[in-house]
């Protein structure tokens, strides 16, 4: 994947403003609320019975932070995303059996969260760069699937 200097700047510039804990928690909570069938991968998280329960669930919050922290590795390694996510792809494929479509859904949710938090900075050009990034990350995570 080729990244222009402008794309890299738009991605890293916005990423520097992201509160990983808050945005990660919100993104994962939104995924579980908007696409309730994704909850089956999080049965060990306890109460996911309502939007209020999901938004207040500390395990959702912690895992959301973990997911977005890992997404930060993509931002730091834009030219090597495939290898950056190689082990996570294996884990999600072989051990967790996560439907790879969920990576795309989470990427789209992340775009919504970023737009909501950074409306002034989230220009159409910025959105295009981030949309490309979440697509590349989703593809890298789905790589180990047969």
Curated annotation (Swiss-Prot):
Q: Does the keyword Metal-binding apply?
A: yes
* Keywords assigned by UniProt, alphabetized: Heme, Iron, Metal-binding, Oxygen transport, Transport
Residue numbers binding heme b: 63, 92
Cystines in this chain:
none
State if Metal-binding is listed as a keyword. Answer: yes
Q: Name one GO molecular function term.
A: metal ion binding
Xref: Gene3D superfamilies: Globins
GO CC terms, sorted: blood microparticle; haptoglobin-hemoglobin complex; hemoglobin complex
Top-level taxonomic group: Eukaryota
Record-annotated Globin domain positions: 2-146
Might you name a Gene Ontology BP term for this protein? hydrogen peroxide catabolic process
* Tissue localization of expression: Red blood cells.
Stretches of the chain forming a coiled coil according to its record: none
The record's note on quaternary structure and interaction partners says: Heterotetramer of two alpha chains and two beta chains.
Q: What does this protein do?
A: Involved in oxygen transport from the lung to the various peripheral tissues.
The record's comment on protein family reads:
Belongs to the globin family.
What is the designated name of this protein?
Hemoglobin subunit beta
Q: Which organism is it from?
A: Phasianus colchicus colchicus (Black-necked pheasant)
Quick one: which gene encodes this?
A: HBB
